[in-house]
Every structure is written in structure tokens, then in C-alpha cells.
Design a protein with these regions (language model features):
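N-terminal, leucine/charged-rich tether regions that mediate assembly and partner docking
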Residues: 1-63
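Short, charge-rich, low-complexity alpha-helical interaction segments
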Residues: 102-144
């Protein structure tokens, strides 16, 4: 395809593999996806199919810091099951090689990861908008991380509030939940 390979002190991308995998019903897709990414020593576009539908996952690879010659994966970015929703279809259309940055195999792979992150943002905001602007991508990634963290904290507080017997403590927990919900609204604006 004419895209130069990539080498630096952290990683080496000589090729990108596209791997397909059919998963059995009841398979633990996230764990299997991570294992496949760990097993293959170069960047992989993993397309999995299970009863829920097709999913695409990617994970940057880098040299291990303490073991020479060993490769470790960074965060696995997965689409989850793709549907016929407008944002999912916009994402699929945006995966074309012609729409990716091609300075190196690293930037090409990062372009696809950025599109997966844009899909996550679109599923929350309702509008798919991919960009290769690093500042926008970093802000989106931070907002997605914040939303994920706040959602987990909110779920934990709701469980505590449901179990709480003392009314004043329950009121305090509900106020904390309201503050988290306000922070979630603010974080969604950064998508």
C-alpha cells in the first residue's frame, strides 16, 4: 500500500495484520480479544464475530521496559458490536485506507484507533466526527476516560444509596450522585 514502516525507541511497526475470528456463543469476547492482541507481536486489526455481531479492536504495541525483545500491548480499543445505527455506519465508512493518515504505519494505525474513539464519543453524543488533529483526539480521549470513571463512581454511589438506612447519609449520597451527573454533562460537552 506504500506506507512506510515506523521505528523509534518505544516501538517498531513493520506491518499491520488483519485477523478475523469467529467466537462461540457465551465466549468472553473482551478477554479473548486481549489474548489475541497479546499473542501476535505486531499491530493487529482484529475483527471478531459473535452472536452480538461484528466488532473491531486495535491495540498499540511497544517494547517492554524491563525485558529486552518482549512486546506489550497498550490499551485495547474495541468498537463493541457494530449495528446499523447511523453513527456505526459512519464509522465503517470512515475506515477506508484513503481516509487515514499515511505518513507511517504508526500514524495509519493511530488513525484507525482515533476512529474507534470517535465512535465511542458518537455513541454518547449522537454525532460521528473523526479527526486526525492530535489535540482534539487527546481531549476526546480524556473526556471518554472521565465519562467512564464518573459512570463507574455513579453506579457505586447508587448501590450505596440504595442500601443506606440512615436518611441523612442517603441524602448526602444523592447529592454526590447529582454532582457526578453534572460533571458527566460537562464531560459530554468535550466530546
Amino acid at each position: 500500500i506504500g506506507v512506510p514502516d515506523y521505528r523509534d525507541e518505544v516501538r517498531e511497526y513493520l506491518e499491520i495484520a488483519v485477523v478475523g475470528c469467529d467466537l462461540r456463543p457465551g465466549a468472553k469476547a473482551p478477554r479473548l480479544t486481549e489474548l489475541i492482541h497479546r499473542a501476535i507481536p505486531y499491530p493487529v486489526i482484529l475483527i471478531t464475530r459473535d452472536p452480538g455481531g461484528l466488532a473491531i479492536s486495535l491495540a498499540h504495541k511497544r517494547w517492554a521496559e524491563r525485558q529486552a525483545g518482549r512486546i506489550v500491548i497498550e490499551d485495547v480499543e474495541s468498537t463493541g458490536p457494530l449495528t446499523k445505527a447511523v453513527v456505526d455506519q459512519a464509522f465503517i465508512h470512515d475506515l477506508s485506507l484513503a481516509k487515514q493518515p499515511t505518513r507511517s504505519l504508526f500514524t495509519l494505525y493511530q488513525g484507525w484507533i482515533t476512529r474507534v474513539q470517535a465512535l465511542h464519543a458518537a455513541r454518547l453524543s449522537g454525532a460521528y466526527a473523526a479527526t486526525d488533529d492530535q489535540a482534539v483526539s487527546d481531549r476526546r480521549r480524556a473526556a471518554l476516560d472521565t465519562i467512564s470513571r464518573l459512570t463507574r463512581e455513579g453506579a457505586t454511589l447508587r448501590v450505596k444509596a440504595a442500601k443506606e438506612k440512615q436518611m441523612n447519609r442517603r441524602v448526602d449520597l444523592n447529592l454526590q450522585i447529582q454532582r457526578l451527573e453534572a460533571a458527566l454533562v460537562a464531560a459530554r460537552k468535550d466530546l
